[in-house]
Amino acid sequence: MPKLEMMLLVLLILPLCYIDAVGPPPPWNMEDEIIEHWQKLHCHEISDLTPWILCSPEPLCGGKGCCAQEVCDCSGPVCTCPPCL
């Protein structure tokens, strides 16, 4: 096999071995990054003891949450929060 063909074969096989060993890169989720950035700019924690967040673009109570549990309305299929001040 000529050197050029051998070199091309090695260059084609080498990345496959690297991907198999390391695994594919995790999918990039732009939505999570946007929400995280928005929360850093606009959200204010009520206290250090509670995980609730005062205002957030996501309609959830708690977790990545949208508002304090006391003012969150979860009567429907989706939780809603009062508008941020």
From Swiss-Prot:
Expressed by the venom duct. Residues 1-21 form the signal peptide. Keywords: Disulfide bond, Neurotoxin, Secreted, Signal, Toxin. GO terms for cellular component: extracellular region. It is found in: Secreted. The cysteine framework is XXVIII (C-C-C-CC-C-C-C-C-C). Belongs to the conotoxin D superfamily. This is Conotoxin Im28.1. It comes from Conus imperialis.
